[in-house]
């Protein structure tokens, strides 16, 4: 870590690009690096995860170095603030409190987080506005669950999904674009609730499906190219046949 800090100090002095960066200019790059880390994790390749973790760490050091230059905070301040928070929010580890389950730990975490804000923070105010919409919906639902606003049984969510699907169909049939958009949002929100109630990460689930579609469609495209065909000139039945072939190959041991 000391070596990394020395490298960053040198870059801030001698590299024109690094020298002109600010917390604002780095923000979008930081988001990109976090998404690349997410991709590496989903790929299951430890070497890629290690590499992308380094890129994210670079940004943490970058922000901390800028803070130190401005006299507001340094990396030690960041680490100590984090340590203090972790110790405070884990009274079952560093104190006398008892947590019988992971769920109890999360509930206590939220209670302590609320107390840190003097009790003036609303339940949902801790959900970042800039979160991707799917993740934001999950976090909103989970925050509400933390105070008891949730379906009593997982099966109850299916009734809500059926209700929202019916309302979506009715809105689309009516031809109202505004109503259709609103009902589609309600339907998607209810589907995310299903995922949450059954312990499924909806973002991971959708990303795996995205990857599966890209993989299978790539197979269709490659086979068409081998045959000297263009996808635009193929019938849907021909493309479906190649798609099914890709599925069969994936299912083979």
At which residue positions do the language-model features occur?
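Flexible "arm" and connector segments at domain edges
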Residues: 1-53, 58-184, 188-253
């Amino acid at each position: 870590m000391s070596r990394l800090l020395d490298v960053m100090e040198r870059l801030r002095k001698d590299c024109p690009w690094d020298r002109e960066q600010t917390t604002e200019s780095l923000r979008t790059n930081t988001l990109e690096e976090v998404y690349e880390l997410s991709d590496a994790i989903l790929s299951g390749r430890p070497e890629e995860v290690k590499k992308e973790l380094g890129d994210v760490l670079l940004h943490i050091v970058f922000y901390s170095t800028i803070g130190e230059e401005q006299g507001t905070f340094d990396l030690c301040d960041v680490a100590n603030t984090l340590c203090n928070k972790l110790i405070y929010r884990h009274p079952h580890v560093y104190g006398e409190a008892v947590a019988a389950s992971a769920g109890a730990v999360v509930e206590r975490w939220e209670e302590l987080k609320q107390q840190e804000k003097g009790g003036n923070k609303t339940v949902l105010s801790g959900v970042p506005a800039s979160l991707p919409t799917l993740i934001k919906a999950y976090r909103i639902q989970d925050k509400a669950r933390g105070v008891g606003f949730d379906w009593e049984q997982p099966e109850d969510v299916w009734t809500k999904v059926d209700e929202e699907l019916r309302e979506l169909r009715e809105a689309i049939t009516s031809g109202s674009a505004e109503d259709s958009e609103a009902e589609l949002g309600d339907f998607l929100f209810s589907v995310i609730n299903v995922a949450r109630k059954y312990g499924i990460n909806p973002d991971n689930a959708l990303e795996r499906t995205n990857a599966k579609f890209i993989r299978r469609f790539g197979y269709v495209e490659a086979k068409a190219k081998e045959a000297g065909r263009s996808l635009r000139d193929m019938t849907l039945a021909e493309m479906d046949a190649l798609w099914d072939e890709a599925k069969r190959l994936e299912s083979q041991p």
